[in-house]
Amino acid sequence: MNSLTDRNFWKEYWNNYVYEKVPQHSEFEAYFPEGMLEGNGRTAIEIGGFPGTMSLYFKRHGYSPTLLDFYIDPSIIEGLEESNGFSKGCVEYIESDFFAFSPAKLYDLVFSIGFIEHFDDTADVIRRHADLVKPGGTLFIALPNFRGLNGLVQRIFDRRNYDAHNINSMIPARLRGMLAAMPLRNVKVAYTRKPMLWLEPRKGAANAVARRAVRLFSYAAKLFPVPSRLMSPYIVISAEKI
């Protein structure tokens, strides 16, 4: 599998990490299939989601979560748990290359946010997600949309981050075609509605200034909440495993 990033990329990326608040609500909730927030002890696995913010979000909603990533710093996970009032170790974590991972079980919910776009073969990455889902379970994937304003912002202010993304993975019609060939039903692929622009945090004053400017522009963009290639920050995929 040809990855657009490597371990050093992510090690440097997480050197800048500041513990964030695990949300009470997710911006993606409007796109979750019915019943997805009712964990009731069901299992979930987050692909490529270190340090596990969304794993903890689903823990809060009653899931037993597992985090799989090929770069994991346990101290960061523990710090995130502690800073958000969770008991230490409530998220199981597995440090492994996704493409070498051999699961001991299947999961009720398999999800990733901002993962599949870092690889050249999008269909293969999605298929491997689907392979981890129990029959009757849920697949949920979100990826950024860099084919509109957000992509322009990344190209101008953070070309390295832009180049770490496969822009061809961000075409809804192509995604629907890939999903149609997999053992899935109730498949939905959609642009999210609420516009949002962002830059990843980097060290240095220039990045801080650029992020403030982009944040102000993002506030203005929210006046146009229309799902579209130009304005939507994300594409979301949901499906049920047959």
Could you say what each language-model-derived stretch is?
Residues 1-105, 109, 113, 126, ...:
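Conserved N-terminal segment of class I S-adenosyl-L-methionine
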Residues 48, 136-137:
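Conserved phosphate-binding and hydrolysis motifs of nucleotide-dependent enzymes
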Residues 114-118:
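A short His-aromatic
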